[in-house]
Design a protein with these regions (language model features):
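Conserved beta-strand->loop/alpha-helix structural units within folded catalytic cores of enzymes
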Residues: 165, 170-171
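Active-site nucleotide-sugar/metal-binding loop of Leloir-type enzymes
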Residues: 189
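A short acidic, glycine-rich active-site loop
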Residues: 89, 142-155
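Domain-scale signature associated with acetyltransferase and cell-envelope carbohydrate enzymes
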Residues: 1-129, 155-159, 167, 177, ...
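Short, flexible, mixed-charge acidic loops at enzyme active sites
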Residues: 133-143
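Active-site/ligand-binding-proximal alpha/beta "capping" segment
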Residues: 174
Length: 209
């Protein structure tokens, strides 16, 4: 049975080669981008939003994407203008030109997130300017999903920043231009221009000249 199935799929691969699959994925993502851009504030020229992309928070019109930027598949863009009884009318996400946002990224804002030009992110990156409640005894007795959103301020990521796989950038952080953040790091404080950071919490491990 196993040999038979291998034979069948070998035949299928002749009529449906991988290059054709890639072409069809390209067409699918182009069509999907033309559809989903109608729900956002602005999507620039030659930008692609790959299928699927989940929009959360009700503030889709406050999401702006620059030119020649790609949002890879299975990403989540959450712009929370309302969460329960809370109102965040100025919540926004702005992504610059020539960026590549990796697969399974989660970008969530109730304040503001600004991502500069030429930014590269790996897979499973979290960029969040908010969290669910604090650490008081009263809040801990509430289910996390029902706690109020709290933010220490917006996030700014400078031009040409590279965030490795599974990096988390948390509320109130500013990352300077040309900075590299190693995989699995958790950024809780500001990072200057031209440095490499790693660890939990992220610390500067090298200055880049």
């Amino acid at each position: 049975m196993k040999k038979f199935l291998r034979f069948i799929f070998r035949i299928i691969s002749i009529f449906y080669p991988y290059w054709l699959h890639q072409k069809l994925v390209f067409v699918k993502d182009a069509c999907y981008s033309m559809w989903i851009r109608n729900f956002l504030g602005k999507v620039g020229e030659r930008s692609t939003i790959c299928y699927p992309c989940q929009l959360q928070g009700g503030g889709q019109k406050n999401i702006y994407i620059g030119n020649n930027t790609t949002i890879q598949a299975s990403s989540i863009l959450g712009c929370w203008t309302q969460y329960g009884q809370q109102q965040f009318p100025n919540a926004s996400i702005k992504i610059g030109d020539n960026c590549s946002i990796g697969e399974f990224n989660h970008i969530t804002s109730c304040d503001k997130i600004i991502i500069g030009n030429g930014v590269l992110t790996g897979r499973y990156v979290l960029i969040s300017d908010n969290n669910h409640g604090g650490l008081s005894a009263e809040e801990l007795d509430i289910n996390p999903i029902n706690r109020e959103l709290k933010s220490k301020g917006g996030i700014v990521i400078g031009d040409n920043v590279w965030l490795g796989d599974k990096v988390s950038v948390l509320t109130g952080v500013h990352i300077g231009k040309n900075t590299i953040v190693a995989a699995n790091a958790v950024v809780t404080t500001d990072l200057p221009d031209n440095c490499m950071a790693a660890g939990v919490p992220a610390k500067i491990v090298k200055k880049l000249s």
